[in-house]
Amino acid sequence: MHKEIHEQVDTIANTMRGRIRPDAVLLHGLSEYWDEIEASNRIYITACGTSWHAGLIGKLLIEKFSNTPVFVEYASEFRYNHTLIDSQTVVIAISQSGETADTLAAVQKANDYGAVTMGICNVPGSSVGRETDCGIYTRCGHEVGVASTKAFTAQISILYFCLLYTSDAADE
């Protein structure tokens, strides 16, 4: 775990690579759905474990800089709750592996109700990447520690990049 804590600087650099320029933020994985994301009237962030905690920070960031209410739910509860989901809803699924069963079930529920689904995960080609409408890979690399330190740092970085992208999109 000590090694992974010290790898966080490289993790952020890898997460930023090709996405952050002095004059712009580039999030190609979201561009096709960005208008729908910005027009949404509510956002749900669903995840498990450490990814859920990243979602809590995402909620604070998004609500501070937008007028959109954000709700963070454990994926295991999201799939059974009577949450208000429709085509004006964005559901962000966060998963380190992209294969967390409860998170995938939450994505399926959101898709069934017509929400725009966005994935944040580390593994290209994972189920979360395939089942969501759009998304961003964290590029944090393999992580051995249970604490998921690098994934947490990368997930928060991606959520912050989304806010920067919003301000870039508003400038156009």
List the predicted regions and their residue ranges.
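Anionic-ligand anchoring segments at beta-strand to alpha-helix junctions in alpha/beta enzyme folds, i.e.
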Residues: 11-26, 36-91, 118
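Conserved small/polar residues in nucleotide/adenosyl-binding loops
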Residues: 165-172
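Flexible, glycine/charged-enriched surface loops at secondary-structure junctions
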Residues: 2, 22-27, 128
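Phosphate/diphosphate-binding loops
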Residues: 91, 95-130, 134-150, 156
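Intein/HINT protein-splicing elements and their conserved insertion hotspots or analogous self-processing inserts
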Residues: 1-9, 13-14
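Hydrophobic residues within alpha-helices
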Residues: 5, 57-58, 106
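Terminal amphipathic helices with adjacent charged low-complexity linkers/tails
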Residues: 1, 155, 159-161
